[in-house]
């Protein structure tokens, strides 16, 4: 029920935004959508005007090369954010904003696109409805597992990594976690400074010529390592070597 409610709310906000933008003179191209709108600007409004107004309100939008604008709604979008988006386009069009005071359930999906069958019917998804119940269930699973806290474990690039609570805590803070991967570069200067400083420190500690922080998993790290080894072999004329001995 919770997942359905979240999905319905996301779609309803997108539908409300589409309705408001149409009243302001903007065209929405996606005939069927769940959370994403594609807006065509009228001749009286330019992309640069929208961008300037949006940035002044600390809002980033997707600006396509053809001049269209993309907007995606998610579960964090609230009434304040919805009205801010509407105000941006209203200001650019020289019209009064349309205030949305409540989020009513309004579906623009055709019946053919709505799911009729049940989903997530396994008892695991149906028996735990509170945070306490879920935490106890996860703890029960944890007790069945073997970890570094109990004994030696087999080699694993993911399981060998340990993040202390002090390291994970900052990741839950808004200044670190609320960043979109496609944010303009000038809005991510702090991240670039963190990445640069950490890379330089690791280079000094290890003596490596360079360090990459891009791999985000053990598998990605192993692949990156193999690529480095491959590049080294090619640099010394041994690019024909293509066999890897992996310890069991």
Positions of the model-derived regions?
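Structural signature of PLP-dependent enzymes
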Residues: 1-15, 187, 237-238
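Gly-rich Lys/Arg/Thr-decorated short loops/hinges at beta-loop-alpha junctions or inter-strand turns
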Residues: 1-2, 29-33, 114-115, 172-186, ...
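Conserved PLP-binding catalytic core of the aspartate aminotransferase-like
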Residues: 11, 24-53, 73-76
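Short Gly/Ser/Thr- and Asp/Glu-enriched loop/turn motifs at secondary-structure junctions
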Residues: 29-36, 63-70, 216
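Flexible inter-domain linker/hinge segments
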Residues: 79-154, 158-166, 171-177
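Conserved N-terminal alpha-helix of the aminotransferase class I/II PLP-enzyme fold
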Residues: 130, 176-216, 221
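Conserved PLP-anchoring active-site segment centered on the Schiff-base-forming lysine
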Residues: 232-248
